[in-house]
């Protein structure tokens, strides 16, 4: 399983790339806002940061756009900034039309805001490079946010779809483990989620227990 970082903060990205070995980045308008920088500034920083390596970076176009031709135009604009940029487009009819055209032009796309199996099927049928089904938002709404990703994965394998699944809005290590057991290609989460997934109360308990044993053990002079 690949780990993508869901962030637009360059310091977080550098840290996660160096120490957590992330394989890519996903951004969205909320992350751009939280970075305190403009959209264009973030795009330029990310393009420069990874200019010498292949490193997929999902850049979400203006969500106000609701016509395919406008989405295509903006997708081309940002794809021209870096060969690493993947154009992130919401799963609407017009968005899927735009993504299909961009893929035909060799521009990679990521269909986002996916909440159903049928949406994910169409994303694969138009040959989007990635599809991003959301987990956390569905679970916050009282729905099962995990099992439908297994359905998507099974359907993709059955019909030999090549679109890679990015599990989005991942909230904890339990979800990461379950997604890995399903064979989901990629998970994307914030830095804190990955860091917290490395912790366990028994690990902390064990360290404390062994520290006490160490201190109580007679040491050679």
Which positions does each model-derived feature cover?
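Alpha-helix-loop-beta-strand connector modules within alpha/beta enzyme cores
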Residues: 40-58, 79-80, 96-109, 146-165, ...
């Amino acid at each position: 399983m690949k780990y993508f970082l869901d962030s637009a903060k360059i310091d977080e990205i550098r840290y996660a790339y160096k120490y957590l070995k992330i394989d890519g980045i996903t951004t969205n308008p909320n992350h751009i806002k939280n970075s305190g920088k403009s959209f264009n500034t973030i795009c330029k920083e990310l393009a420069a940061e990874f200019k010498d390596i292949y490193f997929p970076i999902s850049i979400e176009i203006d969500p106000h756009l609701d016509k395919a031709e406008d989405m295509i135009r903006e997708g081309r604009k940002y794809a021209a900034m870096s060969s690493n940029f993947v154009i992130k487009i919401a799963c609407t009819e017009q968005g899927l039309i735009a993504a299909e055209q961009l893929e035909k032009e060799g521009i990679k796309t990521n269909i986002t805001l996916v909440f159903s199996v049928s949406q994910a099927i169409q994303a694969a049928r138009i040959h989007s490079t990635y599809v991003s089904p959301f987990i956390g938002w569905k679970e916050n709404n009282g729905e099962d946010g995990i099992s439908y990703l297994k359905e998507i994965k099974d359907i993709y394998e059955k019909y030999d779809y090549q679109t890679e699944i990015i599990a989005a809005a991942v909230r904890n290590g339990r979800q990461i483990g379950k997604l890995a057991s399903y064979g989901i290609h990629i998970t994307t989460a914030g830095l804190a989620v990955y860091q917290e997934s490395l912790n366990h109360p028994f690990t902390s308990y064990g360290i404390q227990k062994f520290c006490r044993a160490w201190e109580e053990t007679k040491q050679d002079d």
